[in-house]
Amino acid sequence: MFDAMTDAVTQDMSKILQTKAADLSGERLRNVEAALDATAQQIRGHWSAASDQAARSDFSVLHDGITAARNIVVHIASMR
């Protein structure tokens, strides 16, 4: 459903601190952030197309979770 969430991205997310330590350029965390951002945009599209309030509510909760995950990734990426 969310194409940006590839196996590589989800594996990097599951071990985010190890990913940060191994990725001196920061590219992998930027890829995770971009995937989460793209997924949030897709969710907004699904929310707009939802036909009932329950579905919109579900998509809102999902969007909030993805946005929180993105914020965590940004925070971890900025840690020294």
Curated annotation (Swiss-Prot):
It comes from the Bacteria. Induction: Expression is controlled by the hrpD operon promoter phrpD51. Positively regulated by HrpX. Disruption phenotype: Expression of hpa2, hpa1 and hpaB is undetectable in the mutant, and the expression levels of hrcC and hrcT are reduced. The mutant is deficient in secretion of Hpa2, Hpa1 and HpaB-dependent T3SS effectors, such as the TAL effector AvrXa27. Mutation also affects expression of several Xrp-coding genes. InterPro entries: HrpD6-like. Involved in the regulation of several genes of the hrp-hrc-hpa cluster, which encodes a type III secretion system (T3SS). Upregulates the expression of hpa2, hpa1 and hpaB and partially controls the expression of hrcC and hrcT. Controls the secretion of the T3SS TAL effector AvrXa27. Also regulates the expression of several HrpX-regulated protein (Xrp) genes. Has no influence on hrpG or hrpX expression. This is Regulatory protein HrpD6. The gene is hrpD6.
